[in-house]
């Protein structure tokens, strides 16, 4: 693979878009990529790409580089030839993410249409691309009489993100339906990982740092399409009634501590409706933070930290962020 300096816009081939947030690296102070050479892929490589339009909060800085590979082979070749010191982060639908205002160093990878397919397999399985949405996965399962995947309808994200964080809702979790997943590791090599290698716990896995999920296989149980649709409708109605779905939000902000509901702790601490700048704790569901207009990511994150402080002061419980926070302040 050829290399190009960052001074030029290394963009060739067809543009693709979208993967789950498979690993979110911690902010690092690294040498600007401009000082190094980047591989020239077949896909689209964009410098200083605004990320705010790609995330649900509609706030935050730019990606030093945004890479949209044409296929898994393109991603593998690019990562294999990329300087190992360059940070790599995967971006899905951007629903569980605060991109800090200083932007994200290194390369942000976004998987597109080539990674968004969902096909039925044998024995009540589905073969899903890492960029496929939860709605597409659950709808395809319904169409083929595969029950047990309805809960994915309620998670705003992509397969890669579900696999990385053991996504779950309404009594279901990815660990209960995952057969295995195909990942491209940071060095460009590939691996197939089963659930035993991911060591799933609540909203967490041990997916290797820098790994990107390009495909996954889910297995359900026999069901009638009408019954599956009824359950999906029930879930959809419940979300509509209880969550601020039409707001600029990142989804559930804090993990539920053992034996507690995060929203109840937030409410008891008097944080419902609390604001900092343009950021607000939702009145409808107080485990959701909102961008009410032109909030900065700094304001949104500061509001979350203030909520954590107040909850700790009142209940002694330290809330853990469920939303990922990436990039430089």
For each predicted feature, which ranges?
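Intrinsic disorder/low-complexity segments
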Residues: 1-40
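Anion-binding (especially nucleotide phosphate/pyrophosphate-binding) glycine-rich loop
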Residues: 38-159, 169
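Phosphate/pyrophosphate- and phosphate-bearing ligand-binding catalytic cores of soluble enzymes
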Residues: 46-47, 97, 184-305, 309-329
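Beta-strand secondary-structure signal
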Residues: 66, 127, 180-182, 215-217
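Short polybasic amphipathic segments
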Residues: 116-118, 179-183
